[in-house]
Amino acid sequence: VRTRNDDGFRGYDTNCRFPPQEVVAVTVAVVQFGGSNCDRDAVRALSHLGVDAERVWHEDGLPEDTEGIVVPGGFSYGDYLRAGAMAAHSPIMNAVRDAAADGVPVLGVCNGAQIGCEAGLTPGAFTTNASARFQCEYVHLRIENADTPWTAAYDEGEIVSVPIAHGEGRFEIANDRYDDLVADDRVLFRYCDADGNVTDDANPNGSKGNVAGILGQRETVAVLMPHPERASLPDLNRSVDGRGILQVFG
C-alpha cells in the first residue's frame, strides 16, 4: 500500500491491508464487448470494495436491477474505424444512455472513456497520443474538483498515482467547449508531476489542458483514461489511489 510521508512521497506500508468488504446490495454491470480486456480487473476491484459486480455481455443487455455501470478498457472491435467508435453504436449503449439519464452512475475507463465520448455521454474525443506510441506507465493526477461523487474521497488539489495504458488517449475538444468544461468544473483530473505542477512534460499523451478525466452533463457520468481498477488491490497494485474513484458504486 502506498502511503504519504511529510515530503509527499508515497512509499510502501507493508503492514497495511484492506481485506474484502462485506458485499452490499448494489449491482454494477461491467459491460463486455469483443476485445474488452479490463472487465475482469474491474469486477475484481469492485468486489474487493464489497460491490456486487458482474460482467455483462453487450448482446445480453443490462440486468433490470442495474444500479451502476462500468464500461471498461480494452480494444473493443479491434479499435477499427477509431477507438470506441463501433462499440458506441452497440444497442447496449442505448440502455447505458437511458440509465445515465435516470441518474445511474456510469464510469468509462480507457477504451470505455473513448466509447463514452463516441456515444455522446461526454464531450470531446480521444485520439492518437502525441508520441504516436502506446503509453503504459504510472502517472500523477491532480484532483481538480473534489465536489463530485467520483472524487469525494479526495481533497481538491490532491495528487494521486494511477496507471495508464493506451495508444489513443489524447483528449481533444474545441476551444469553446473546453472553456465550458472548465467553467462548469467538469474537469476531474489533470496529468501533473509529483509536486502537482501541470506541465507539458507531465502530459503523457498531449491531452488538451492535461485533461485525464471529465464529467458528463450529469455528475453521475464520468470518463477517464487512467485505470483506477489497476490501482485498487493492495496485494497486487503498486498504488491503491484509484479506490476512491470506484467507491461511488459502494
Show where each model-derived region lies.
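Short acidic/polar capping segments at secondary-structure boundaries
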Residues: 112-114, 121-122, 132-133, 145-148, ...
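Conformational gate/switch positions in structured elements
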Residues: 74, 111-112, 167, 228
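C-terminal and late-domain segments of enzyme folds
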Residues: 151-250
